[in-house]
Amino acid sequence: MQVKILDTTLRDGEQTPGVSLSVEQKVMIAEALDNLGVDIIEAGTAIASEGDFQAIKEISQRGLNAEICSFARIKREDIDAAADAGAESIFMVAPSSDIHINAKFPGKDRDYVIEKSVEAIEYAKERGLIVEFGAEDASRADLDFVIQLFKRAEEAKADRITFADTVGVLSPEKMEEIVRKIKAKVKLPLAIHCHDDFGLATANTIFGIKAGAEEFHGTINGLGERAGNAAIEEVVIALEYLYGIKTKIKKERLYNTSKLVEKLSRVVVPPNKPIVGDNAFTHESGIHTSALFRDAKSYEPISPEVVGRKRVIVLGKHAGRASVEAIMNELGYKATPEQMKEILARIKEIGDKGKRVTDADVRTIIETVLQIKREKKVKLEDLAIFSGKNVMPMASVKLKIDGQERIEAAVGLGPVDAAINAIRRAIKEFADIKLVSYHVDAITGGTDALVDVVVQLKKDNKIVTARGARTDIIMASVEAFIEGINMLF
């Protein structure tokens, strides 16, 4: 059995509070979704705005493998806009619960909804569109009416139907029961559309598929209004590894797609989010990592490479000998039992103070205890920042790289960005360093607060973390960045 996926990141996902995507950004995400292997891309609502119309039009002209879809109401103008934008299909919804019918069609009854739905489906078919017809708020509706609505949609030649748990009130058991009843009465392919208001979107989607639904709706990273939609990455992995149900998704592209959506939507993925969160394949505890080095399956349900990730071992107050030895082997160092005891004690001391232990911290501790003096390849000699009102921030930097002086300048969106860009220009002949993440905290209060900057840098397949702490956020950022560079050289 292979399940179809309708990705609604560009429609329902964009309804996440604070998210607004440009046409260019929507095209970028659509191309990534197509490369990922989703079957249907709901690219927006053609009638909603000129931007949505243009996005659907642009995406439809890209020659993607996925079916390009527009959201629509049971209104001719919505259908016309979708067809004029070049969409192949529409996901057209009609209110099915009395709550929604009364709110959207005051004074009208269920028969009116059926009549208008049939008219809209027939008109959409005349316009040459594939029609996926959805019952909105179906989980709070009379199920007999929902089935009646679906049967009339089938008679009107709709291509697919969707049961929408619009406010996320179903339990997995109830979803399974409902899907079985619908499949017994209606022969059209059935999709399910779940929201996460009670944290059950993934479970409800899985139970719906188990019961016979052939398609599910979801978003990358679980984006969506309120608590979000079913997260595609979670559903796909759970279906395949727990139930043996396949999709067309290229799983190794899940992480990169997640990071692209995170970057363009500016909605940060929680670190503990399954599959794509920073901590999903990160290990610290000494006992756990010791077992992990012997057999990765001991504390991982799947290999991180399956979803395009790498296993990360971090050190902190729970660090054990195995973790430290792994890092020392990578550095080519060896320690006596007494030295190892001292290294572990110092690492735990930092963790006990509530601080994150970075790779640079660990290396410094190891080299201090082993009395190894390492000459840093990259040193900051001078830094100048120019910024002000109506002035594009610019930075000039002087570095010594292996004893050779390099001077570069660059602009940026802010002074920190300008400084980092200048450093990257200075080292570009030596290495292509990518900034993976940037995090800043104020350690003390007041305008003279000490700030703690932690950066994550990547070179090839190696990722390191480094810290800088100053009262000047620019200097703290530069210090962290250069410390990380020295870890990668």
Curated annotation (Swiss-Prot):
GO MF assignments:
(R)-citramalate synthase activity; 2-isopropylmalate synthase activity
**The keyword Transferase belongs to this UniProt entry's keyword annotation:** yes
Q: Which GO terms describe its biological process?
A: isoleucine biosynthetic process; L-leucine biosynthetic process
What sections of the sequence does the record tag as coiled-coil?
Answer: none
Which positions, given as ranges, span the membrane?
none
Q: According to the UniProt entry, what is the EC number of this protein?
A: 2.3.3.21
What's the catalysed reaction?
pyruvate + acetyl-CoA + H2O = (3R)-citramalate + CoA + H(+)
State the function annotated in the UniProt record: Catalyzes the condensation of pyruvate and acetyl-coenzyme A to form (R)-citramalate.
- Recorded protein name is Putative (R)-citramalate synthase CimA
